[in-house]
Structure formats: C-alpha cells, structure tokens
Amino acid sequence: MTVKVAAGRGDAGTRLLAGASGVGFILAICGSNAMTPLLPGYMDRHGFGPAAAAVLFATYFVALIVILLISARGPLIRHTRTVLPIAFLTAIVGDLVEIVGAWYPLLLFPGRLMTGASVALSTGAAAAMMVAARGERGRAFMATGSLIGAGTGLIAAILIAVYLPWQLVTVYAVHAVAMTICLGFLFAGLRAAPDLLAPDRDPVPTVVEPELADVPSAHTGDLDVVVESSRSRDPGAYLVGALAWAIGALAVGAMPNAILATGISDSLLVAQCVGGACLIVSMLANFAGVGLRVITTLPAVGSLLALGWSIAIAGLAMGRLEVILLGTVIGGIGQAGGYRVALAYITVGLTPIQQGRVAATFSAFAYSGAGVMVVLDGVAGQLAGTIGGAVTIGVVYAVTSAIAIGLVLRRTRRTAQPAVTRPVDRETADTAS
C-alpha cells in the first residue's frame, strides 16, 4: 500500500509559515558553520590545541544529537508550532553567548551547545511543517535545506571573517540579526495559518488501494528513487548519511587547520576555501541534479565519499593544495548524493509526523558520525601529529565506507525481486517472462 500526503492549503498564510520555517531552518544550519573559519583565531587567541579545537567544534553535535533523539521518540514533533520559535530564539541566544566567548573562552562551549540545540529543535519540526504545507514536494526539503545552509553559511562566514573587522564578533552578530528577522516572519505565519499542524492534527494520509498502487518511491524531486519496501530501518542508508555529513565536518572543521599547521599555505582564506570546497560543491551539486538525476544509488555515493576523502588525505601528505582540492570536490559531490538519497530511501511514504521523527533520527545518526570523526581526528592529530592523525582517520573513514556499501548491497540482494503492484506491470512482467 502506498501512502501519500496531501499538500496543505495554498493560501498566503500557509505559504508564509512554510517559507519562514524553511528559511529559518536553513539559517540555523548556516549558524552551525559560523564558527568554522574562526577556529584558527580561537587557537591563536585562547591557546587551543588541535584536540581542544576539535572538541569545541564537535560540542555542537552533543546537544544536537540528544535533542534529535528525544524528538524522534517523544512528543516534540507534535508541538511543531511551539518548537520552531523556541529553536530560532535559541539560535539567537547562542550567537550572543559566542560573541562574549571572544573574551571568555569557556562561554564558547555553552554557546556552541545552544547552536546545536537550535538546529536539532528545528530539524524535525521544519520537516513536519514542510511536508504538511507542501505535500510530497516538501519531503526532500531536509536534505536540500541542510546542504544549502551548510554551503551558504560557510561561504558567508569565510567572507565575513576575512574581510570584515572584529571577526570573532561580526559573524555571530550578522547571523543573530538574520534569525531575529526570520523569527518575526515565523510569528506572522503562525498567526496567519492557525490550523496548520495544530496539536493532534497530523494530516490524514491518502491510502491508495494495493491493486492500483505504484511501486513505492522515495521522492527526491525530479527523480523517483524506486525502492521495494520501507527502508526506515536500513543500517546501510543511515551509515551512508553519517559518512556524507562526516566528510563535510572533516573538510571544514579539520582540513583548514591541518593546511595551516603543516605550512602548505599560510592564508586563512585559501585554507578555508580548499576545505570548504566540499560543502560549496555539495550545495552546487544538489542544484545540478546529484541525487536527483545522476548518482542516485547508495553504493555509488559511498564510493565517491571514500574516494574523495582518500584523495584529500593523500594531498595533505604530499603537501599539494590542488590534490586536496580535488579530493574535497569529489567528496562534496558524494555528500550531495549521499545525504539526499539516503534520506529519501528511509522516508518514503511517511506522514508529516512520521517524516519529522524519522528525519530527526536520521539527522542524529548523521551528526553523530560527523562529531565522532572530528573528535577522533583532533585526538589522533594531538597524539600522532597532523599528518599521522589525518592518515589514521582517512583509513577509518575508508573502512567505514566499505562496511556501509556492503550493508546496502546485502539489503539489495535480499529484496532483489520487487513486487509488481499495478495490473499493467503484471502484464508486462508476464510478457517478459
């Protein structure tokens, strides 16, 4: 049986609420990268070592993962209309705390926790809101919004940090102002669309009779990724999603520091752009159709992720910026496909509330992988040196990718005979046999 969700009413209030929710979620993701180009500055100003910088960067994941897991198991998603304003307000307070952290370094950690909390609270809530407002067209929003937010947030943070004064303050101030404006639009949307996702009003899915049902497909936009059954518990898909987010975290949270530490370049702008190319290319690849029309299988994106990061590590060991850049570009293409396709596979046919919960679980797992990889990279760099630590984590990443691909292929073999559900398909299958 195929489950389809009808889109919400197309009135102005619904559009305003959906728009404010979507833009706010993207801005929250942007805020998660505000600190990225500032890490070398914190290392110089506060005397942080590689491990301390990695822990500071990864502190964001702690609150994020805990809240996402609570959202997936508890009633938070059913209170989307309350959770979203709290999420946006938390992001604003986190920015203010991190501004003060320029003078009091210990405050950077609770500020980073608040940033993670804001992303976590908005993740499931925005997913539910977008599906309720836009129907199936909103189902792919989480992957698209995450990639857009990560890419644009990093670009903006780099430009502000390099070209504007008071870099440890200005980045957060700009983000806080943008979030405040979006919060105002969100309140206006909530008032204009009082019935959309009101408590205890999960939209009733449209059930299509089995004999008339299409083969279930994970809607990613222009392309339907065909699956034979629900993959909401597919470990391979979850692991590919974690690898996709981990490569972005490693590229922007670890690689620029490694480039500067090894003397491959002494330019903050160059180091950030080489590492940040992963997220920037990921965002552009998303618009170019990666995960939509090309590279739409989990083994393909898993292979790209492993290949990309292996090339980047080889470039770091050789001291060649162009090789590192090639690796981060390939990894960015893999990230765009990996996160989007994996999320599409595990959320096929879900209602808005189910979508929010599964998306929250998936995001928690993906961010867990990113946080673990970044912390391990920092610890390995502290113990074995910059190059030795990077090579160690590169091997761990490649092995994990191989395991993920193996799990996906094993699942695919078990479901190699798809069910033919439409009469016309049965006739075609009989003719072919």
Task: List PLM regions with ranges.
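Transmembrane alpha-helices of Major Facilitator/SLC transporters
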Residues: 271-294
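Structural signature of the two symmetry-related core transmembrane helices
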Residues: 82-96, 297-312
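A late C-terminal transmembrane helix in Major Facilitator Superfamily
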Residues: 343-386, 394
